[in-house]
A protein has these predicted regions:
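C-terminal and inter-domain tail/linker signature
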Residues: 2-4, 15-165
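Bacterial N-terminal signal peptides
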Residues: 9-14
Length: 165
């Protein structure tokens, strides 16, 4: 009687342990390297019903994914298919910047960077080693500038305290 019990505990216990769910490290999953993909896995679909508050939340999520988390999947899910690039030397369209950001490298942390969304202009800003500006249309990043930009000192949208995305 004890021999089968010994068998079950020595053979089945490790197998059951392997079947248990493993907690994922969120920081590692955000820094996913997607460069094996020829294009972003998903882009933003413009939706004219997206509110100012939702756009501000999306702008914060974009800043986090681009600068702080190194999360190309989320970053590109907030860029529309007609993305216009105003940086000399770079073509417009998300597929043209995909190779620059697919690797999941982060650019800074929240303590050393800043972000702002100005509802009056539908523009968001991120400051890290440079300052970028994006125009949002129907809840999606539509245009980008990064030369001579400054983050506004006032007029930045205040997100609710929980900053849910």
């Amino acid at each position: 009687m004890q021999l089968p019990l010994l068998f079950y505990t020595s053979v089945l216990a490790p197998a059951i342990g392997l079947a248990a769910p493993v907690a994922q490290n969120e920081a590692l999953s955000k820094r996913e390297n997607l460069c094996s993909l020829p294009a972003p896995p998903a882009l933003c679909t413009p939706d004219p019903s997206v509110t100012v508050e939702e756009t501000a939340k999306r702008a914060y999520a974009f800043y986090r994914s681009f600068v702080v988390d190194g999360d190309p999947r989320t970053m590109f899910s907030l860029i529309d298919s007609t993305y216009t690039q105003h940086h000399p030397g770079y073509a417009s369209g998300p597929q043209n910047i995909w190779p620059l950001f697919c690797n999941g490298n982060k650019l800074g942390n929240e303590a050393s960077t800043a972000w702002c969304f100005v509802a009056a202009t539908n523009m968001s800003y991120a400051r890290y080693s440079t300052t970028d500006r994006w125009r949002w249309v129907d809840g999606c990043v539509h245009e980008h500038w990064d030369q001579g930009e400054r983050i506004p000192s006032e007029g930045c949208y205040k997100l609710p305290a929980n900053r849910s995305q």
